[in-house]
Amino acid sequence: MSDLDNSNLQKTLASMLKEATAIESSDLYGKVIVQSSDRWRVILCAQGLQWIIQKKESSHAGPWRAEKYLTSRSALIKACGTLGLLSDPATEVVLFALPEHVSQLAKK
């Protein structure tokens, strides 16, 4: 493979990776707040307007699907508790460390 072909391949791969990290349903999404298990995680939406509780499709190769959309920490913690996602102490610590409202993230 020539240097030019290799350079183009690297650029293409970098572009694909950047795109994958911007897609909320991707395993590579870059704004994951906490992953409480193999099948559940909390992310910050791409626009930074809300937290989303996502569940991995039953096929482990499947995408992440949104289950709940929340803007307040208290509602997020309550929803996670209802779904049984607070059994991991590390998840609890991360969620309680979030600001009371998602809009406060932009102010930090």
Question: Residue spans of the language-model regions?
Answer:
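Short secondary-structure boundary/capping segments within folded domains
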Residues: V42-L44
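A short, exposed loop/beta-hairpin motif centered on an aromatic-Gly-Thr core
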Residues: G62-A79
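Short beta-strand segments and strand-loop junctions that repeat across beta-rich extracellular domains
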Residues: A46-A66
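Negatively charged, low-complexity tracts enriched in Asp/Glu with abundant Ser/Thr
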Residues: M1-W40
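Intrinsically disordered, low-complexity, charge-dense segments enriched in Lys/Arg
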Residues: L85-E92
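Low-complexity intrinsically disordered segments
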Residues: E92-K108
